[in-house]
UniProtKB/Swiss-Prot annotation:
Domain of life of the source: Eukaryota
Gene assigned in the entry: Mrpl27
Protein name, per record: Large ribosomal subunit protein bL27m
GO annotation, cellular component aspect: mitochondrial inner membrane; mitochondrial large ribosomal subunit; mitochondrion
UniProt main location, coarse: mitochondrion
Record flagged with keyword Ribonucleoprotein: yes
Record region (Disordered): 28-48
Residue range covered by the transit peptide: 1-30
Species the sequence originates in: Mus musculus
Amino acid sequence: MAAAALTLRTRAAVTALLSPTAPTALAVRHASKKTGGSSKNLGGKSRGKHYGIKKMEGHYVHAGNILGTQRQFRWHPGAHVGLGRNKCLYALEEGIVRYTKDVYVPNPKNTEAVDLVTSLPKGAVLYKTFVHVVPAKPEGTFKLVDML
C-alpha cells in the first residue's frame, strides 16, 4: 500500500512538471534564422577601368602628368618617364611626348625574360614600345656674367 501511494505521488509530481500550468511556460520563442539560398551572379556589371594612353604623340606635358595606364606592360618607360606602382607611366619633366619602337634588352636577373629570349630563334630581336618625354628647352633663363 505504501508502494502504491509512492507511485501515485511520483506520477502526480511528473504530470505536474510536464503539464504547464503557468502562462509563461505556454509559449517560448527562440532566435532562429532560415537557411540562405545560394546565389550565383554576384558583383553584377562593373564599369571599365579606363586603361590606355592618356597623352598622345606630340602633346605637351608637365612633370607628374600621367601618360598612360596599363595592367600589363604594353608600353615601357623611356627617357624622362617614371613607372608607378600600378604600372602607370608619368612624366618626370615637362616636354613633348614621343613614342618609339626600340630593341628590348631584358634584365638578366629576370628568369622569365631570359627564358623568353633564349627560346627565340637565333638572330631574332624583341621590339617594345617605349614612351619618352623630350624636355622643353628653357628660354630666357640665362645668367649674366656679372651675376656669377
